[in-house]
């Protein structure tokens, strides 16, 4: 009888410890996220409004901040469409064709994931800078790449290149070629097949890649910092402006710009979640 009671107590203790373990893990996770993300993000918002709403609006009117916003949006407008077109073309080549160097192309697409953005910026400087391979040719034709927006655009395009291709490739491989072959049999040409058959099947994964590309392009710091020189009012995107304003002890202005970047990140996160849910439903349907 005593042994039975001891066994019951041991079993109860094990059950209690098992029930406490998930709660402990949840608590640790929430504490970690709170310390690393939530509290710092909340502090940015508080500091941005430390001078009140009028001070926040005044900071938004800062000429250098507005120029940084304009340049940040310009980088997005240039890089996102180009990387979307490249991503679609590369995805079709990899998923639909067999050719020498296919594995190499896939590795090159993944290169921006593994290489440091600072190294990427340095690569662009060594190619297009005054002492670079193409520097003398560009200078003789009065074409400025480094310390100007074209170099910033090249850096942004490089770091945000893989996302559309990497999202569309598995989608194309999953849907196969049956529908495209059927459309071709019925007399549709290549463009008609793409617009009416293929694109509707990959649109959500493509949009998901576009959202990731946009987030990466607008938030890039390292590569753009190297090629731009971070000249206030001329070659500063929002991330560069945040750093420079903070170093110049314009803390409220810096937090205002950081809050704008945080707002962009929040919008991106919401769109990402919506597209993840949509692509999940689409995969279950297929």
UniProtKB/Swiss-Prot annotation:
Entry's localization field: Cell inner membrane
Pfam family, one: BPD_transp_1
Domain ABC transmembrane type-1: 69-272
Membrane topology: Multi-pass membrane protein
Family membership noted in the UniProt record: Belongs to the binding-protein-dependent transport system permease family. CysTW subfamily.
InterPro entries, per database record: CysW_permease (IPR011866), MetI-like (IPR000515), MetI-like_sf (IPR035906), Sulph_transpt2 (IPR005667)
Task of the protein: Part of the ABC transporter complex CysAWTP (TC 3.A.1.6.1) involved in sulfate/thiosulfate import. Probably responsible for the translocation of the substrate across the membrane.
One GO location term (cellular component): plasma membrane
Keyword Ion transport: no
GO molecular function (one): ABC-type sulfate transporter activity
Residue intervals passing through the bilayer: 20-40, 74-94, 108-128, 145-165, 207-227, 255-275
Keyword terms, alphabetized: Cell inner membrane, Cell membrane, Membrane, Stress response, Sulfate transport, Transmembrane, Transmembrane helix, Transport
Transferase in keyword set: no
Organism per entry: Synechococcus elongatus (strain ATCC 33912 / PCC 7942 / FACHB-805) (Anacystis nidulans R2)
Induction or repression: By sulfur deprivation.
Record's subunit section: The complex is composed of two ATP-binding proteins (CysA), two transmembrane proteins (CysT and CysW) and a solute-binding protein (CysP).
Name under which the protein is recorded: Sulfate transport system permease protein CysW
């Amino acid at each position: 009888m005593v042994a039975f009671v001891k066994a019951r107590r041991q079993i109860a203790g094990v059950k209690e410890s098992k029930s406490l373990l998930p709660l402990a893990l949840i608590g640790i996770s929430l504490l970690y996220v709170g310390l690393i993300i939530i509290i710092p993000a909340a502090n940015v918002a508080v500091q941005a409004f430390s001078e009140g709403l009028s001070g926040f609006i005044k900071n938004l009117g800062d000429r250098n901040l507005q120029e940084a916003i304009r340049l940040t949006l310009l980088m997005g407008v240039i890089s996102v469409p180009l990387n979307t077109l490249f991503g679609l073309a590369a995805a079709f080549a990899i998923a639909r064709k067999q050719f020498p160097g296919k594995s190499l192309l896939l590795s090159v697409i993944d290169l921006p994931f593994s290489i440091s953005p600072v190294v990427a910026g340095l690569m662009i400087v060594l190619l297009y800078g005054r002492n670079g391979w193409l520097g003398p040719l560009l200078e003789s034709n009065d074409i400025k790449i480094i310390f100007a927006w074209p170099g910033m655009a090249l850096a942004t395009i490089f770091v945000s290149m893989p996302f559309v291709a990497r999202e569309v490739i598995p989608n194309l491989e999953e849907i196969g070629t049956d529908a495209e072959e059927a459309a071709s049999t019925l007399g549709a040409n290549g463009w008609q097949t793409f617009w009416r058959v293929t694109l509707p099947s990959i649109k959500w994964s493509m949009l998901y890649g576009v959202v990731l590309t946009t987030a990466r392009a607008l938030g890039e710091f390292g590569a753009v910092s190297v090629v731009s020189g971070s000249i206030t009012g001329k070659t500063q995107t929002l991330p560069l402006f945040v750093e420079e304003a903070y170093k110049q002890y314009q803390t409220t202005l810096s937090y205002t710009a950081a809050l704008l970047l945080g707002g962009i990140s929040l919008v991106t996160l919401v769109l990402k979640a919506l597209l993840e849910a949509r692509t999940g439903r689409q995969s279950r349907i297929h």
